[in-house]
């Protein structure tokens, strides 16, 4: 796969630059999972409208691609993930010729690779949905969580989410998951900023 050319696996075309270890992330199973989510949710995501697409220089785009691979292969895996908006597109990952939702890419790669492991360690995969103002988009995320649990054989409510109101600081990140699940997004509207916040919570994986 690390040829620097486009390659298609399970109906998904990778058009990013070749970077070390990307084969470990973009497996046939992971790409098939992304393709399934894309096929089931692309029409609803398109109805949200087109998200703004930042223009990058080639060197910046290559670094961004490397960062995408690196953060998904990081050890130990993150408890909290901050996916991009569903309406944004990932132009370097295509399904049937159409760019995938950047949100689906960020969510799907992390959940496929890490959800079972996180649960086995007594943690839960959290999606931090910062500034998601549309009710339609929030409902889409909830439906994505439920469908991902079904496809991956995860327990109901295994995927958790925090929905932050725009401009509201994170008060704490030591979530126990009691107030949120795949069906209920936790809305945190506390107006008081906190001096120190821990963006990563959970037990460190054993070496």
Regions found by a protein language model. Name each.
Residues 2-207:
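Non-catalytic helical/linker scaffolds that mediate oligomerization, partner binding
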């Amino acid at each position: 796969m690390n040829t620097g050319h486009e390659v298609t696996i399970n109906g998904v075309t990778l058009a990013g630059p070749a970077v070390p270890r990307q084969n470990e992330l973009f497996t046939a199973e992971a790409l098939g999972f992304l393709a399934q989510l894309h096929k089931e949710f692309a029409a609803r995501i398109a109805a949200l409208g087109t998200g703004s697409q930042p223009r990058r220089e080639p060197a910046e785009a290559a670094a961004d691609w490397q960062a995408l691979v690196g953060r998904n292969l990081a050890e130990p895996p993150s408890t909290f993930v901050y996916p991009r908006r569903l309406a944004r597109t990932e132009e370097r990952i295509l399904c049937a010729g159409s760019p995938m939702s950047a949100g689906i890419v960020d969510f799907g790669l992390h959940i496929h690779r890490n959800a079972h492991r996180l649960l086995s360690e007594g943690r839960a995969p959290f999606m931090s949905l910062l500034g998601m103002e549309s009710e339609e988009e929030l409902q889409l995320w909830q439906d994505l969580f439920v469908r991902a649990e079904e496809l991956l054989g995860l327990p109901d409510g295994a995927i958790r989410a925090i929905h932050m109101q725009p401009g509201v600081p994170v008060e704490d990140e030591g979530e126990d998951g009691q107030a949120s699940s795949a069906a209920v997004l936790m809305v945190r509207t506390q107006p008081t900023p906190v001096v120190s916040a821990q963006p990563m919570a959970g037990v460190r994986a054993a070496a």
